UniProtKB/Swiss-Prot annotation:
Keyword field contains Transcription regulation: no
Enzyme Commission (EC) number: 1.17.1.8
Catalytic activity: (S)-2,3,4,5-tetrahydrodipicolinate + NAD(+) + H2O = (2S,4S)-4-hydroxy-2,3,4,5-tetrahydrodipicolinate + NADH + H(+); (S)-2,3,4,5-tetrahydrodipicolinate + NADP(+) + H2O = (2S,4S)-4-hydroxy-2,3,4,5-tetrahydrodipicolinate + NADPH + H(+)
Gene3D superfamilies: Dihydrodipicolinate Reductase, domain 2, NAD(P)-binding Rossmann-like Domain
Family from the record: Belongs to the DapB family.
One GO CC term, this protein: cytosol
Domain of life: Bacteria
Subunit structure: Homotetramer.
Record organism: Pectobacterium carotovorum subsp. carotovorum (strain PC1)
Pathway(s) per entry: Amino-acid biosynthesis; L-lysine biosynthesis via DAP pathway; (S)-tetrahydrodipicolinate from L-aspartate: step 4/4
Zinc is among the record's keywords: no
Binding site for (S)-2,3,4,5-tetrahydrodipicolinate: 160, 169-170
Protein name: 4-hydroxy-tetrahydrodipicolinate reductase
Record's keyword terms, sorted: Amino-acid biosynthesis, Cytoplasm, Diaminopimelate biosynthesis, Lysine biosynthesis, NAD, NADP, Oxidoreductase
Length: 273
């Protein structure tokens, strides 16, 4: 085991993302796996977390309750479902544990709960932990300021057949970045579905299109289309390790923060560019 003062707990340790988070923790300096959790009733409870991730024995047994590992971790990483994440948030808030939240699909009440908890604990909450995606969001701001007022803006995203929310959290973050740069409210200008006779396109709208198919890890494109030319800014992920590495990097960063709500822009200092 690596010597480290930053102990990370992974929720959903047996899932695709959970296993890659465990691999990322093993590969990265400055962190160590402190705890691994699975949902109540999972057949993986009692398994060795390292073996689940294909790393060999780690000595960390998968548990079903945060109470059982309360003293074993400093930062919790959660890429699960909103209802589960909010329960984990309440625990981390109560016990003053930092949190990395990669879960998407929260309603306004869920987002408010995260914001409130961040008054007392450090939280990095992001729709996407890929370095490349967050650089793309910065580029979208720049493009929107230059050409967003006279182009048609469309966002197209594609993910694997098992993804349960649409549009993706990343696609929504792209829309928010563009809308903010243009002084628009995404809630009032977003168009999520077109069918039948829709009429002419509203020039102030931001359209979204969603694909769910096969094993696509994640593809996102923002299109700024004018008459005679268009600019497309695209990010394609070929492995979930890019998200896992970003989340662990965020865990290292948040470990020095007593409280506050942050995103990957803060972790990567993108606002300084």
């Amino acid at each position: 085991m690596k010597n480290s003062s930053i102990r990370i707990a992974v929720v959903g340790a047996g899932g695709r993302m959970g296993r890659q988070l465990i691999q990322a923790i093993e590969q990265m300096d400055g962190v160590v796996l402190g705890a691994a959790l699975e949902r109540s009733g999972s057949s993986l409870i009692g398994s060795d977390a390292g073996e689940l991730a294909g790393l060999g024995k780690s000595g960390i047994t998968v548990k079903e309750s945060l109470n059982a590992v309360q003293n074993d971790f400093d930062i919790l990483i959660d890429f699960t479902r909103p209802e589960g994440t909010l329960a984990h948030l309440a625990f981390c808030h109560q016990h003053r544990k930092g949190m990395i939240i990669g879960t998407t699909g929260f309603d306004d009440a869920g987002k408010a709960a995260i914001k409130q908890a961040a008054q007392d604990i450090g939280i990095v909450f992001a729709a996407n932990f890929s370095v490349g995606v967050n650089v793309m969001l910065k580029l979208l701001e720049k493009a929107a300021k230059v050409m967003g007022d006279y182009t048609d803006i469309e966002i197209i995203e594609a993910h694997h057949r098992h993804k349960v929310d649409a549009p993706s959290g990343t696609a929504l973050a792209m829309g928010e970045a563009i809308a903010d740069a243009l002084g628009r409210d995404l809630k009032s200008c977003a168009v999520y579905a077109r069918e039948g006779h829709t009429g002419e396109r509203d020039p102030k709208s931001i359209g979204f299109a969603t694909v769910r198919a096969g094993d696509i890890v994640g593809e996102h494109t923002a299109m700024f289309a004018d008459i005679g030319e268009r600019v497309e800014i695209t990010h394609k992920a070929s492995s979930r390790m890019t998200f896992a590495n970003g989340a662990v990097r965020a865990a290292i960063w948040i470990s020095s923060k007593e409280n506050g709500l942050f995103d990957m822009r803060d972790v990567l200092s993108l606002d300084d560019l």
